[in-house]
């Protein structure tokens, strides 16, 4: 590759229509006071500067109004969750009735699977009871699927199929999934897929997965932890049955921030789902009459259990407003440019250091990935990770030898990629 030119990089940042958004986030700094080059937004996003003020609004309301804060104040807590319907719908490509904020990702995953995974408990070879997922999925998803299967008295060794992804980064990561869906046929109950793979950064072709699964009578659920805020999503148009996500990565809503879930409109009127229910999923009009029998709220709100986690949701509102204002199209365009530039830097580094026996795991096709690049090193991987850390580049380590880097378009700059290049020159 041609060495990145500092003047050209400065001009790119100067002309970047999203460049000003970086000033709306707190910049973490090293012990010497210098700011980090932060490439860990795939693990924890930065804090929007508006968060302390948003929290103060709610703590002031609590202090001054106490229980009356449910019905009074800037954002009455009774309907607090409704603040997120519009932004979340735009974020994931849904109708407002199809999304709701609350809980945490794995809690929502269990709630959704409790409703949508309805396996045939027969032990014959034609029983529809198999869950299909990608191999090497995030462990919480694996544990959740194992326990869902055991909850129905079935054996995960028989009923969970994990599809190995291709080693060749030029290959289509979705192809093995489609082949396995067709092979399982009528035995397949649910495809439960991480839309963007947390380890490799692969972005799967969700419309093709949905088409293949529905063709054999199966449902499709998605874990959007590494997709929401990272890649364009059109859950409603694609026909995805259900999905859930967290908000502390690309959505910048803070550690343990509130999750979200999506239920496609075609399932809203079904009364055969084994949904687990709580009082906040009851219709709002009669909720406080405390009726004995559950009357579901409209759409995804019926899947709520408890009232809004206001102190966690206040930062979420600030972060979503920034993302909503920037727009996914602009974010994706910048993301493609940033990641392509970082990819060239890493490939050049690996070419100059064959002794490391390194390679990029993330697909080479930009349409098959988000912003993250995962670089595996057979030798001295942790040495490189530590070296980058000492030189002000904050990345993410995953055993056995992978460094993940995620230039996030909402707050990273092209100069951050230049800094990586300059640091790698001296390794």
Whereabouts are the PLM-identified features?
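Pyridoxal 5′-phosphate
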Residues: 1-427
């Amino acid at each position: 590759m041609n060495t990145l030119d500092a003047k050209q990089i400065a001009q790119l940042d100067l002309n970047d229509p999203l460049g000003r958004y970086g000033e709306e986030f707190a910049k973490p700094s090293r012990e010497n006071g210098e700011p980090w080059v932060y490439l860990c937004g795939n693990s924890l996003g930065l804090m929007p500067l508006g968060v302390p003020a948003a929290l103060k609004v709610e703590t002031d309301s609590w202090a001054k109004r106490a229980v009356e804060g449910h019905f009074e104040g800037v954002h009455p807590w009774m309907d607090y969750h409704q603040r997120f319907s519009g932004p979340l719908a735009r974020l994931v490509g849904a109708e407002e009735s199809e999304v709701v904020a609350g809980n945490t990702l794995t809690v929502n995953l269990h709630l959704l699977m409790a409703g949508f995974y309805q396996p045939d408990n027969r032990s014959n070879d034609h029983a529809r009871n198999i869950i299909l997922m990608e191999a090497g999925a995030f462990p919480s998803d694996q544990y959740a699927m194992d326990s869902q299967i055991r909850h129905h008295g079935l054996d995960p060794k028989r009923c969970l199929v994990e599809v190995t992804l291709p080693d060749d980064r030029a290959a289509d990561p979705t192809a093995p999934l489609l082949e396995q869906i067709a092979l399982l046929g009528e035995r397949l109950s649910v495809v439960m897929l991480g839309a963007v793979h947390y380890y490799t950064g692969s972005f799967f072709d969700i419309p093709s997965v949905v088409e293949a699964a529905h063709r054999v009578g199966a449902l499709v659920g998605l874990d959007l932890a590494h997709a929401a805020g990272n890649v364009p999503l059109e859950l409603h148009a694609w026909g995805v049955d259900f999905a859930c996500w967290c908000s502390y990565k690309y959505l910048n809503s803070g550690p343990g921030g509130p999750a979200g879930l999506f239920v496609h409109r075609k399932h809203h009127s079904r009364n055969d789902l084994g949904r687990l229910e709580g009082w906040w999923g009851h219709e709002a009009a009669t909720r406080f009459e405390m009726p004995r029998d559950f009357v579901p709220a409209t759409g995804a709100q019926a899947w709520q259990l408890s009232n809004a986690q206001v102190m966690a949701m206040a930062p979420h509102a600030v972060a979503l407003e920034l993302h909503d204002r920037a727009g996914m199209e602009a974010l994706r365009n910048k993301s493609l440019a940033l990641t392509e530039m970082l990819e060239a830097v890493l490939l050049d580094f690996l070419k100059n250091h064959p002794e490391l026996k390194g390679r990029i795991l993330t697909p080479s096709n930009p349409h098959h990935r988000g912003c993250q690049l995962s670089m595996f090193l057979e030798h001295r991987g942790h040495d490189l990770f530590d070296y980058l850390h000492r030189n002000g580049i904050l990345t993410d380590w995953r055993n056995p030898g992978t460094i993940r880097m995620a230039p996030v378009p909402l707050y990273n700059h092209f100069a951050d990629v230049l800094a990586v290049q300059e640091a790698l020159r001296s390794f």
